[in-house]
Amino acid sequence: MLRVLFLLCGLSGLRTKENSERLHVQVTVPEKMRSVTSEGFETEVVYNIVIEGKTYTLNLMQKLFLPRDFRVYGYDSTGIMKDLEQQFQNFCYYQGFVEGYPNSMVIVSTCTGLRGLLQFENVTYGIEPLESSIGFEHVIYQVKNKNESISLYAEKEVEFRDLPYKVQSVQPREFSQYIEMHVVVEKNLYKHMGSDTAVVSQKIFQLIGLTNAVFTSFNITIILSSLELWIDENKISTTGDANELLYRFLKWKKSYLVLRPHDVAFLLVYREIAKYVGATFQGKMCDINYSGGVALHPKTISLESLAIILAQLLSLSMGIAYDDINKCKCPGSVCIMNPEAIHSSGVKIFSNCSIEDFSRFISKQKSQCLQNLPRLEPFYKQDAVCGNSIVEAGEMCDCGTAEECGRAVPICCNSATCRLEVGSQCAEGECCENCTFKERGQSCRPPVGECDLFEYCNGTSALCPDDIVIQNGHPCGENQWICVDGSCISPPEQCKSIFGEEVEGGTPECYEELNAMADIILGICGITHDGYKKCESGNRKCGKLMCKHTTENIIDIKNATIIYANVSGSICLSLEYKPDHLDAAKMWVPNGAVCGSNKICRDKACVETTYVNLGCTLQNCNNQGICNSLQHCHCNPTFLPPNCSAVDERWAGGSVDSGNFQGGGVPGIGGLTSVGTPPFIPGVPGVRRYMEDVYQTAKPTRWPFFLLIPFFIILGALIAILVKVQFQRKKWKTEDYTSDEQFESDSELKE
């Protein structure tokens, strides 16, 4: 296997503060021109600001990346983790552009004035409120490298890509993707950022906002699922190079981040001088064992540069390689995956090579974690209010007012303190009954449909376990269709849900004839800038949904047009909504519908399925269970997890995830000593891909071998002794030695 290592080296060129400076500092007063409000929150806002005597118009759209259950964690004096209960807003972060400048990007927060960056093609301006100003005055300044000739990287031959790439543009996928990230800030960076929890949190919010702007073209949102601050002491040693630190962090992550949901975790580390700026594993974004990274923050780089470092690490973890500047092109002066992007100002765009890499990544099953949709409604997080019937941070329960709590029988929650009453284990939840936890094994969430699974109370929590479903790609609907995200994707069933039980799925002739017409009413495969898109011959089962009318009744659906067409003696039905209607998606064959052998519909095209050759198969489950969405076996009754091989007649069925299993952890989750793919340490010009023999010299991969050397020496000695004893026994049976001297002489000779 080709093992690849990237090194970002030579950053000593950034040691001095003279390498960058703020120029043309001036005061401006932003003027709000208009805004669009939804449910009390500004979703769109327009500002005018003056820079060097010229007025610029900023068009901003709300960008939500803090989920409702977001938490900031710290540790108390005993080392126990605690919720720091920070007050913050998630609705005041915006992303947009400067009117009249197509290659521009604006990333600002409006929580307390305007704070953020205005990026033009080759220059970046920072804006922040002027402290103690009473007239909404802001400071605006240009950030520019003073000595751009400094080489930041080792002088070595560069070889970033082994495969040729097309130069033409490749459009990314249209559907949204989400990367849920847990960020850890180590002690020295916490001090460097201000030694204040609120200030550091806001800077991390700004960092994630800047990183989100980078991934706009991929329609990816970076969700900051939780933030952890190592205020007084680091939980692991942060010394050593990025490679060693990555292995150390992943080992810690495996033990301590299991209860905090995330797709990927990153440790941010401050260094006065750094030879490397980060490490991650290539293409391992959704692999629970390797979905992590380390980003080093050298003293003199800006938050904008740190965002590029983070974006490059995230890109590498999605299998997006560094650009070969001779083969890869982008509209901007510096592409994102060009290592020089870390030290250039202005807007940066992914190259055509990066877009192709990303398209390959999301077309595979291993990218599935990016499809989880978090809760992203606007909210304002403030101190917990006891008595509002909402359990908030710091509360064990909240049953409402004293009068409301008094109606409960029995009373589990103290209405004055929002703490559990003495003797109570819980106050509410699917697995709470009469103030105590329900016994393990009681069903708390029955399956909804044939692609869902049972969940059970675990006996130690009031909450039902997470909703786990059958693995994508499992056959359903009499083996004609497949499960996708817990639903059986069956066009015939969709026809029934829309038109009624008497309607059947459309005939092959309906799809073949009508979806080939490029007619908005009869059949299309989408709408483009050039008009209606005709379905190509291989995609006709993935365009407009076709159903078969079996009665003489006229169907009427509010706000929809029903189309009837006679094709080969069958009455074909299709549906037409306005494109912006809430139910417009019902017009189309759903993503995941089977359209051929090992093919499914995706974005109105019939493509090779990614739901085959998965890590979990029926054979892994001893043919006595099925695989769930976490690729663990959900075993039949009497057959026990994790692999459905052991038997217990009392077992009702389930998995290690369903709540009713009392066994240990899940075997087969490898540790760091079994790493099969080396980490990427993002590099800069002068860095090449190292082959396997070079990678094997890395410290984290050689220590297990040295631990085994004494074992092999001892084993060899034992084998030699046994062979010699057997040899001597044979001699004792055939020769009669009369003296020790003769014995020694014979022994030396025969040896």
Curated annotation (Swiss-Prot):
From what superkingdom does this record's organism come?
Eukaryota
Q: Which residues form the propeptide?
A: 17-173
Annotated Peptidase M12B domain residues: 177-374
Q: Which gene encodes it?
A: ADAM2
Domain called Disintegrin: residue spans: 383-472
Pfam families with a match to the protein in the record: ADAM_CR, Disintegrin, Pep_M12B_propep, Reprolysin
Task: List keywords of the entry alphabetically.
Answer: Cell adhesion, Disulfide bond, EGF-like domain, Glycoprotein, Membrane, Phosphoprotein, Signal, Transmembrane, Transmembrane helix
Annotated disulfide bonds: 286-369, 328-353, 330-335, 444-464, 616-627, 621-633, 635-644
Q: Which GO terms describe its molecular function?
A: metalloendopeptidase activity
Q: How does the record describe its quaternary structure?
A: Heterodimer with ADAM1/fertilin subunit alpha.
Entry comment, domain topic: A tripeptide motif (VGE) within disintegrin-like domain could be involved in the binding to egg integrin receptor and thus could mediate sperm/egg binding.
Q: Spell out the SMART domains in the cross-references.
A: ACR, DISIN
State if Protein biosynthesis is listed as a keyword.
no
Task: State its location(s).
Answer: Membrane
Question: Quick one: signal sequence residues?
Answer: 1-16
Q: Name one GO cellular component term.
A: plasma membrane
Q: In which tissues is it expressed?
A: Expressed specifically in testis.
PTM info: The signal and the metalloprotease domain are cleaved during the epididymal maturation of the spermatozoa.
Function in brief: Sperm surface membrane protein that may be involved in sperm-egg plasma membrane adhesion and fusion during fertilization. Could have a direct role in sperm-zona binding or migration of sperm from the uterus into the oviduct. Interactions with egg membrane could be mediated via binding between its disintegrin-like domain to one or more integrins receptors on the egg. This is a non catalytic metalloprotease-like protein.
Q: Which SUPFAM superfamilies match?
A: Blood coagulation inhibitor (disintegrin), Metalloproteases ('zincins'), catalytic domain
* Gene3D superfamilies per the UniProt record, alphabetical: Collagenase (Catalytic Domain) (3.40.390.10), Disintegrin domain (4.10.70.10)
Protein name in UniProt: Disintegrin and metalloproteinase domain-containing protein 2
Supply the InterPro entries for this chain.
ADAM_Cys-rich, Disintegrin_CS, Disintegrin_dom, Disintegrin_dom_sf, EGF-like_dom, MetalloPept_cat_dom_sf, Peptidase_M12B, Peptidase_M12B_N
- Which regions face the Cytoplasmic side of the membrane? 724-751
What is the predominant subcellular site recorded for this chain? membrane
List all membrane-crossing ranges: 703-723
Q: Which residues lie on this side of the membrane: Extracellular?
A: 17-702
